[in-house]
Amino acid sequence: MNEQYSALRSNVSMLGKVLGDTIKDALGETILDRVETIRKLSKSSRAGNEANRQELLTTLQNLSNDELLPVARAFSQFLNLANTAEQYHSISPKGEGASNPEVIARTLRKLKDQPELNEETIKKAVESLSLELVLTAHPTEITRRTLIHKMGEVNSCLKQLDNKDIVDYERNQLMRRLRQLIAQSWHTDEIRKYRPSPVDEAKWGFAVVENSLWEGVPNYLRELNEQLEENLGYRLPVDFVPVRFTSWMGGDRDGNPNVTAEITRHVLLLSRWKATDLFLKDIQILISELSMVEATPELLELVGEAGATEPYRFLLKGLRGQLMATQAWLEARLKGQRLPKPAGLLSQNEQLWDPLYACYKSLQACGMGIIANGELLDTLRRVKCFGVPLVRIDVRQESTRHTEALGELTRYLGIGDYESWSEADKQAFLIRELNSKRPLLPRSWEPSEETSEVLNTCKAIVDAPKGSVAAYVISMAKTPSDVLAVHLLLKEAGISFALPVAPLFETLDDLNNANDVMTQLLNIDWYRGFIQGKQMVMIGYSDSAKDAGVMAASWAQYQAQDALIKTCEKAGIELTLFHGRGGSIGRGGAPAHAALLSQPPGSLKGGLRVTEQGEMIRFKYGLPEVTISSLSLYTSAILEANLLPPPEPKDAWRHIMDELSDISCDLYRGYVRENKDFVPYFRSATPEQELGKLPLGSRPAKRRPTGGVESLRAIPWIFAWTQNRLMLPAWLGAGAALQKVVEDGKQTELETMCRDWPFFSTRLGMLEMVFSKVDLWLAEYYDQRLVKPELWALGKELRELLEGDIKIVLAIANDSHLMADLPWIAESIQLRNIYTDPLNVLQAELLHRSRKAEEEGKEADPRVEQALMVTIAGVAAGMRNTG
C-alpha cells in the first residue's frame, strides 16, 4: 500500500515543483513565496496546529485584490495536476493499476469456485451481458476541454517517465514537455467565458469517444476475451460486443429550452459525420495492412475480376468510397444544403459490417487468423459498439409538456380539455386513438410554439435513421397516461418501429407509486401487445434525494426496483432498469461495484443502463486505459450480481428501513422545507447565487425562474453544499434516524444488516465517504464570514447533528475511524485537503468582498469575480465532483 502510494506522492510532488517554477517565471519570487507560505500553513493547520490555522485565515483575508487571482489559480491548478497524477496512478503498473485487469479474472475464479455454478451457466451469463452507458452533459464538466486535453498529455508524460529503460536525454525531453504543458495551462484562462451550447456539449461527448473510447473499447474486449479463454476456455464471438454508448447531449430537453427539435436533428447529423470520420481512419489503416492475395471463393466472387489481385484492398476501397460520399452528404446537410442522397449512403450498421466481416471470414478460412484478429477485429467491434450513429441519443422531455400539447389539441378539436380530464378519461381517449387507423392531427391546425416544439421533436425521431434514437424518457412521470401520451404523439408523427418509452420516476411519491403505474399499463391489452415483452423504466436518484434526503430516497429506489422486477417477472416482461445516478453521493453516485451489488436481486437481468454524468465521464473514461478499468469493473459486477445475487432482505430489515426512511425524511424536510431560516441560511452560507454566474452547462440552474429549494435543480443544490464543505444533502436525516433506531434497542440488528446486506452496508459506506470530505471548521468559517449572526444558531445545530451522525455510523460499522477499509481513498482526500482548504477560506473571503460591494451599490471588482470562479472550479477539483 505505502509503496504503491509513494509513486503517487512523488509524481504529485514533481508536478507541484514544476508548477511552482512556472509561477515564479510568470509572476516572480514574491507570489511563489506567498503561495508556499499558505501551503505550509495549510499543512500545519491540517495537522492540528491551531495557531497556524489562525495565521492561515489572517493571511488569506489580508491578500490584496491583485494577489487573489494568482493564489487561487495556483491552488486550483495544483489540484488539477494532483487529479491527473491520481488518474494515472489508477492505471499505473506501480499503483492501483497493478490489479485492474485482474478484476475480471478474480470474478471468474470466484464464480468457478461456487459449487452451484457450472461453466456453462457462467458462459450463458457472459453471453447475456449488456451494458449501456448514457453520457450526459450535466452536472456539467467544470474543467474546460482545452485544459482536459493538456492534462491528458501530462498523463502521457507520466506514463513514459515510468519506463525504467528510458535514457537520460529522453527523460530530459519528457521533463521539458511537462514544463511546456504546465506553462500552457498556467497561461490559459481556466474559466469559460461563455456557456456551452447543446451542440458544444455534444462535441465534448464525441471528443471522449475519439480520444478514449475508440481505442479503449476494443482493448477492453481483448482483455475480456483473454480472461475468458484463460479461465473458461471460451472465446467471445466476433459479433459479441456487450457495451453500447448513448448520449443525452442534444436530446435532453427537460427544463432546457436551448435543446430544440432542430438541435436534435443537427446533433444526430453531426454524430453520423463524426462516425464516418473515425471509420475512414480505420479503413485507411486496413487498406494499408490487408495487402494479402489469398482469399476464399466467396470473397473472390464478391470482388469480381477487377479485384482478384488484391481482394481485401479492393473491397475496402469500395467501402472507403461509400464513407467519403456519406461524409460529404452529411457535411452539406450540416451546412443547410439539401442534396439528393448518394448511392450507397451509409445509414445502417450492416452496410459497414458486411464487407468487413467478409474479409474477416476469408482471412480466418485461409489460415491468416493472426491478421484477422488484429486491426480488423477491432474495427468490427467498433461497428457493433458505435456503428453508423457513433452514439445513439435519448430524447428526454417533461410529462407536463405532452399533457399541455394534447390539451391544446383537444380544445381545438372541440372535444373538451384533456388537461382537466380524470386519469380514467385520459386513458380511455389515448387507447381509443392508439387503436384508431385515422390520423388525429388536423392539417388546418396551427399549434402554439411550445406544442409545435413537442410535435417537431417526435418528427425528428421519426426522420432519423432507425437505431439512432435509443429511447424516449419522460421525466416527472406520475401516471399511465403520461406514458400512453408519448406513444400517441409518436404514432401521429408516423413512427414505424417500437421505440422504448421509459417513464422516469424521480420524487419519493412517484417512486412509491411506480409499481402501481406499471401494473396498470401492463393490464392494458394494446400496451401489452405493443411493447413486445420489453419495458424500460428509469429510476431517478438526484431529485428523489433532494425531495426526501438520501436515506428515504435510497430505500424508495430499492423498493421501487424490487416491486417492478417482481411485477415484470410475473407478467413475462423483460425489464431494463435505467439508473439516473449522479457523480456525487447526494445524487446517487457510488463506486460502481458496490452500487450494483447493493441493488435488489434480479435488477441486472435485463442488463445495466446507467447515466455517466459530467465530470465523472472524465474520471472514468478520460483515457483508454481508464476505460478498460471502468468497463472491467462494470462487467465483473454485473456477472456477480446476476450469478450470485445479494440476499432478499429479511422482513425485520425491511421494517427497520421503513422506520429509518420515515424518521430521516421527516427530519430532512423539517429543515429544508419547514424551517423558515433554512433558505436564507442556504443562500448566504453557500455560493448558490454566485454559481449561476459560472458558464457551465447549456441548461438553466432552475426549472422555473422563481421559487425556493424545490425549484432549484438537484445539481446546483448539491454543488453549492459541496463548496462550503458541509455537504448537507448527502447526509441530512440519515444519522439522526440511525441514532433513534439505536436508542430503541436495535443496534445489534443494524450491525447484522451492515454485515449481511450489501444494500445497507453500501449506504453506510457512502455516508463514510461523505463524512471524510466534510469539514466542520470550514463550514463554520463560511458562517462567520457570510451569514447574519441571527442565523448562526441554525448552522451550529446542523454541524452538531453532523458530529453525532459520524459517531453513530462508525459505531454501527464497527470502524475506529472513517474509511478504515479504503485507506487509499482516505489518503487521497488528506493529500488534497492541504490544497483545497486555502481555496475554501479564500472563497469565503471573496464571497464576503463581492457581496459587500453589491450591498454598497459598488461596481463588482473583476479581479474578485474571476478569483471567485477559480476557487469554485478548484474546490470542485479538490472534492472530485461538482454536483
Swiss-Prot record:
The keyword Zinc does not apply. One of its GO terms (biological process) is tricarboxylic acid cycle. It is an enzyme of class 4 (lyase). SUPFAM superfamilies: Phosphoenolpyruvate/pyruvate domain. Disulfide bonds: none annotated. The keyword Transferase does not apply. One of its GO terms (cellular component) is cytosol. Coiled coil: none annotated. Pfam families: PEPcase (PF00311). InterPro entries: PEP_COase, PEP_COase_bac/pln-type, PEP_COase_Lys_AS, PEPCASE_His_AS, Pyrv/PenolPyrv_kinase-like_dom. It comes from the Bacteria. Its cofactor is Mg(2+). PROSITE patterns: PEPCASE_1, PEPCASE_2. The active site is at H138, K546. GO terms for molecular function: magnesium ion binding; phosphoenolpyruvate carboxylase activity. Belongs to the PEPCase type 1 family. This is Phosphoenolpyruvate carboxylase. It comes from Enterobacter sp. (strain 638).
